[in-house]
């Protein structure tokens, strides 16, 4: 009897939680090694992970990221297929199309049109679509990729809301920690719909917290667009009448980049009333 030689045409490597016992830099190195290995002929690598490092470093090939989610004893699978990825890009561009239509509308006032032109710039349609395709690879960095593992993501307009709410959850609102919330700064209201579209495909529940910016026609357009963009994974939306500083009853700093520091300074120095903090917590509880 002659033993047959085993010479498979392909090799499947299964790796459970490769991040175990590795600090982030080592995880980065291992991820690069696994990607290089999977690029070889006849090699396929499948990993299971709870590490944002492995998620963020594979966003450019987001179709290779599969999210498993258990609900009421049933495990569901979510994946952004290539078709879904293209649909996300097209849906993201709907806001540009909406603004462009307002430019052609004779009932849109000059001030609003000037603001829209400033937002749109002179980017050509083809290039704009290409830019949409790479936005997530730029934005879903190591920190933001943590949103993939949250029970619910609180999408905030800017860094001020994120910094303050994160601080309160870590230090004051102990009961909210158990809700496994991730507070996401999307770097401006004009990006909120992009994350809503992505989270829909990945089955990630989310709520939105933003400024209404009253008496601003362009913001009225985007506010309504966000409302209309709700999907089955969008829980709730709340708009402050103006800015969070107005809600908290504190002044705005002279520089925009000082806003997160400004809010935290006023809070730590007892300049924000307990009633305001209570009302803010009630808003967050309704959102999640």
Feature locations, PLM:
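Switch/communication elements of ASCE P-loop NTPase nucleotide-binding domains
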Residues: 1-136, 142, 220
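Acidic, Mg2+-coordinating catalytic modules of nucleic-acid enzymes
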Residues: 95-155, 159-288
């Amino acid at each position: 009897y002659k033993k047959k030689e085993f010479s498979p045409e392909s090799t499947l490597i299964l790796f459970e939680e490769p991040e175990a016992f590795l600090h982030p830099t080592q995880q980065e190195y291992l991820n690069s090694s696994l990607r290089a290995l999977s690029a070889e002929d006849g090699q396929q690598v499948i990993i299971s992970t709870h590490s944002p490092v492995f998620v963020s470093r594979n966003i450019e090939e987001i179709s290779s990221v599969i999210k498993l989610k258990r609900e009421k004893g049933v495990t569901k699978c979510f994946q952004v297929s290539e078709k879904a990825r293209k649909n996300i890009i097209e849906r993201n561009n709907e806001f540009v199309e909406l603004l462009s239509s307002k430019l052609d509308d004779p009932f849109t006032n000059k001030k609003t049109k000037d603001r829209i032109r400033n937002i749109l710039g002179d980017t050509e349609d083809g290039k704009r679509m290409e830019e949409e395709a790479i936005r997530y690879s730029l934005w879903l960095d190591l920190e933001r990729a943590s949103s993939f593992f949250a029970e619910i993501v609180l999408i905030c307009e800017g860094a001020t809301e994120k910094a303050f709410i994160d601080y309160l959850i870590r230090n004051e609102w102990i009961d909210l920690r158990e809700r496994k919330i991730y507070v996401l700064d999307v770097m401006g209201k004009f990006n909120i719909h992009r994350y809503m579209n992505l989270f829909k495909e990945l089955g990630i529940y989310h709520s939105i917290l933003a400024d209404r910016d009253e008496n601003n026609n362009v913001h009225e357009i985007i506010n309504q667009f966000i409302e209309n963009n709700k999907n089955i994974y969008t829980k709730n939306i709340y708009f402050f009448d103006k800015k969070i500083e107005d809600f908290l009853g504190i002044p705005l700093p002279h520089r925009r980049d000082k806003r997160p520091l400004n809010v935290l300074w006023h809070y730590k120095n007892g300049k924000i009333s307990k009633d305001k903090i209570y009302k803010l917590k009630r808003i967050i509880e309704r959102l999640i």
